[in-house]
From Swiss-Prot:
Organism: Lysinibacillus sphaericus (strain C3-41)
Family: Belongs to the UPF0295 family.
Name this polypeptide is given: UPF0295 protein Bsph_0336
Record flagged with keyword Electron transport: no
RNA-binding found in the keyword field: no
GO cellular component, one term: plasma membrane
Superkingdom, natural source: Bacteria
Length: 117
């Protein structure tokens, strides 16, 4: 199982990957320089990836301003918590603001709403 990262860092990593994917797709268009239509398609897809990355960065920036900032009990640095449970950005200490989850084993499923029957 992969180690869990903080949600903000996960989304930022996705946005960074979109930028690199966009550049790689645009460079892929160079291989088709004899066909202007294919070059146009590859360049457009690359630019759309970069625009998508910009949108994701703007969205996580807005989300980050609304996140609750807490001091990590382990490393004593300030970190942001999204949802009921999250990890410290610096030391990967599990954090929660829900008193009913204190002392329980960290599980990402605590952030999902359960359906009551």
């Amino acid at each position: 199982m992969k180690p869990y990262k903080s949600k903000i860092n996960k989304i930022r990593s996705f946005a960074l990957a979109l930028i690199f994917i966009g550049f790689i797709v645009m460079y892929g268009g160079i291989f088709f320089k004899n066909s202007p239509i294919l070059v146009l398609i590859f360049m457009t897809l690359g630019v759309l990836c970069i625009i998508g990355s910009t949108v994701v960065y703007a969205w996580i920036g807005l989300l980050s301003t609304r996140a609750i900032q807490v001091e990590c009990p382990n490393c004593h640095k300030h970190t942001k918590v999204l949802g009921r449970v999250d990890m410290c950005m610096y030391c990967n200490e599990p954090l929660t603001l829900d008193p009913t989850l204190e002392g329980k084993e960290f599980d990402q499923s605590y952030n999902h709403k359960t359906k009551k029957s």
